């Protein structure tokens, strides 16, 4: 089994997926990792909406593409989308949701699944039809979309990692 550091160093954003849905137990492990992310004052503001329904997934993709001004699938064909929302009442909700997404990406890597953080959840989830959808899920409160994590089996190989840029660490001793 890979160490945590090995997982962090091997993870890449997957931009091409097979249409095979990951096993439910693996998706549940990814969600569990997200739920255990650190959060400001332990408010646990993020909520994860795991979407495996193809019709909803395709609507999310279409609306995300419209916000981006693109015609292609911004979810790269991934069959599962995990929408991370967060309660806006928590002062650290954006940071908390970001940590949730990070934990989930690392969990996907450990399980041999590909993942990619897709932006524009804020804009899509602010649309009236998606605000109503959030309410229909039984989520009380006011939520903001933090990010979408697409998850699936990679279709193809990964390129070698790019070197890290210099000058990004300063030690004060």
Region locations from a protein language model:
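Acidic, surface-exposed loops and disordered segments
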Residues: 1-173
